[in-house]
A protein has these predicted regions:
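Structural recognition of alpha->loop->beta junctions
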Residues: 74-92, 239-248, 304-319
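C-terminal accessory regions of radical SAM enzymes
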Residues: 303, 307-316, 323-376
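Structural detector of well-ordered beta-strand residues that form the stable sheet scaffold
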Residues: 62-63, 83, 223, 287, ...
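Radical SAM [4Fe-4S] cluster-binding motif and immediate context
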Residues: 121-289, 294, 303-307
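Short amphipathic alpha-helical segments and helix-helix/interface helices
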Residues: 7, 48-52, 72-73, 95, ...
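Acidic, low-complexity intrinsically disordered segments
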Residues: 1-184, 359, 364
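Short, hinge-like loop/turn segments at secondary-structure boundaries
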Residues: 36, 78-82, 100-101, 240, ...
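Structured beta->alpha junctions
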Residues: 39, 43, 67, 83, ...
């Protein structure tokens, strides 16, 4: 979605952007005037190869995204410029410098209000041409940026800041209507997933948005990542489900306090079952995220967690391996302790072990992950 938003900025600046998602599309044969790539850690090597190939053809390259933002010195070996952080406020300058042949090595974005971000009607035609638009079961929106939590394994606040900036509810309604037109193949009740890191970071806003969807009359089923606070608030949960909430992804992360303390998470495992039951009673499903590899966990954690998750009736479980992503407190701690075993970024995928676990081997951790999925 980030590239689509930047495409809108490029159009405003008089450029003719073409957005390519390599999950679904082949690269065009045409040589562009400028190549802009967004880089996640797990695809960094692939992005660097592509950037090198474009530069070999004389095409200037700009890299952005989480990985390039947090390891710019590495990224700069493969590009002309790095844009660090949110690019919205600086991308116009980047394009102007590119047109003048005067790209700077580094650009630093700054935070801005969400109502200043281009709305999706400015790039919906691009999305409508993508192959995914013909068969995807959902469309996506972002209503907030930032997070009020500070989990050790997460880099969100390094990129989007602490706290929550959100779009006016009426703006979100208009964007839902645009997505319903793009996704006409989905029928009357389109499904929208809010990409926010925590839609419930501001419970008042979550309530206002739910009420706005209800009062607008727009028919939509929606899902979101949300912290446990939404499940605790019975009245708000009821309003959200009436407005169309059907799926909540909650990062439970662990079932024992030691693991949660280690990652600076304030969840209370003893209430998980009650909260899942409340969400089900309200009419929504639960996708739960659980992480393996914390120092307090031994080889018995996989079956224990799978049984626990099954007993509390989580609908879909997402098990993963603790991954020390650059820019996180987990990365800094493991790097200082010389526990990181590889910097092969493609292995930073949440399913491979890239560090030395405290109470098991790396092989046990990877095998245990598969065990948890089988047991659940």
């Amino acid at each position: 979605m980030a590239l689509l938003v930047l495409a809108a900025h490029a159009r405003r600046a008089g450029w003719e952007p073409r957005v390519i998602d390599q999950n679904f599309q082949k690269l065009p044969d045409e040589i562009p005037d400028l190549a802009c790539l967004t880089v996640w850690t797990s695809i960094a090597a692939q992005a660097y190869r592509l950037a090198d190939a474009y530069r070999a053809k004389g095409v200037p390259v700009v890299l952005g995204g989480v990985h390039a933002s947090l390891i710019p010195i590495e990224a700069l070996r493969h590009c002309d410029s790095v844009v660090s952080g949110e690019a919205d406020t600086i991308f116009g300058t980047v394009l102007a410098d590119a047109a003048a042949g005067k790209l700077q090595r580094m650009y630093k974005g700054s935070f801005q209000d969400m109502d200043a971000v281009p709305m999706n009607h400015e790039w919906a035609d691009i999305l409508d041409k993508w192959p995914i638009a013909r068969y995807a079961p959902l469309n996506t929106l972002q209503t907030t940026r930032g997070c009020r939590f500070n989990c050790d394994f997460c880099s969100v606040i390094r990129i989007n800041g602490r706290g929550s900036r959100h779009s006016p509810p009426e703006r979100v309604i208009e964007e839902i209507k645009v997505l319903k037109k793009v996704g006409q193949h989905l029928g009357e009740f389109a499904y929208v997933f809010f990409l926010d890191d925590d839609l419930a970071a501001d419970l008042d806003y979550c309530g206002e948005l739910s009420e706005a969807i209800l009062s607008s009359g727009v028919k939509v089923r929606w899902g979101a990542q949300a912290s446990i606070g939404l499940a605790r608030n019975t009245e708000l949960l009821a309003t959200a489900t009436r407005s169309g909430l059907r799926t909540m992804f909650i990062g439970f992360e662990g079932i024992d306090r030691d693991a949660l303390v280690e990652c600076n998470k304030k969840n209370r495992p003893g209430e998980y079952g009650e909260l899942v039951a409340k969400v089900h009673k309200a009419g929504a499903g639960i996708e739960g995220g659980f992480i393996f590899g914390f120092d307090s966990q031994g080889p018995d954690c996989f079956e224990e967690t799978a049984k626990f998750v099954d007993n509390i009736n989580v609908d879909v479980a997402h098990f993963s391996i603790l991954t020390p992503y650059p820019g996180t407190a987990t990365y800094a701690r493991m790097l200082a302790d010389d526990r990181i075993t590889t910097f092969d970024w493609k292995r930073y995928n949440m399913y491979s072990c890239v560090f030395e676990p405290a109470k098991m081997t790396a092989a046990q951790l990877e095998t245990g992950l598969a065990t948890a999925y089988r047991e659940f």
